[in-house]
C-alpha cells in the first residue's frame, strides 16, 4: 500500500520537522513550550 507508506512518511516529517528547525535555528527563546 503506497498510500499508507506516504501517510506514515507525512506523520514522521510532521513530528520531526519542528525538532530539525529548532536545532537549525539553535534559539531556545523560540521554543513554543516556553511562551511565558
Swiss-Prot record:
- The entry's keywords: Membrane, Photosynthesis, Photosystem II, Plastid, Reaction center, Transmembrane, Transmembrane helix
Q: Where in the cell is it found?
A: Plastid membrane
| Primary location recorded for the protein, binned into one broad class | plastid
Q: Which cysteines are joined by disulfide bonds?
A: none
One GO cellular component term, please give it: plastid membrane
The record, for SUPFAM superfamilies, names:
Photosystem II reaction center protein I, PsbI (SSF161041)
Q: Which residues cross the membrane?
A: 4-24
Write down the Pfam families for this protein, in alphabetical order: PsbI
Tell me what topology the record assigns in the membrane. Single-pass membrane protein
Cytoplasm found in the keyword field: no
Q: Which PANTHER family match?
A: PHOTOSYSTEM II REACTION CENTER PROTEIN I (PTHR35772:SF1)
Quaternary form? PSII is composed of 1 copy each of membrane proteins PsbA, PsbB, PsbC, PsbD, PsbE, PsbF, PsbH, PsbI, PsbJ, PsbK, PsbL, PsbM, PsbT, PsbX, PsbY, PsbZ, Psb30/Ycf12, at least 3 peripheral proteins of the oxygen-evolving complex and a large number of cofactors. It forms dimeric complexes.
Function comment: One of the components of the core complex of photosystem II (PSII), required for its stability and/or assembly. PSII is a light-driven water:plastoquinone oxidoreductase that uses light energy to abstract electrons from H(2)O, generating O(2) and a proton gradient subsequently used for ATP formation. It consists of a core antenna complex that captures photons, and an electron transfer chain that converts photonic excitation into a charge separation.
What family does this belong to? Answer: Belongs to the PsbI family.
Q: What is this protein called?
A: Photosystem II reaction center protein I
Source species: Aneura mirabilis (Parasitic liverwort)
**Gene name per UniProt:** psbI
Amino acid at each position: 500500500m503506497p498510500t499508507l507508506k506516504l501517510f506514515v512518511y507525512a506523520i514522521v516529517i510532521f513530528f520531526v520537522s519542528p525538532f530539525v528547525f529548532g536545532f537549525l535555528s539553535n534559539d531556545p527563546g523560540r521554543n513554543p513550550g516556553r511562551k511565558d
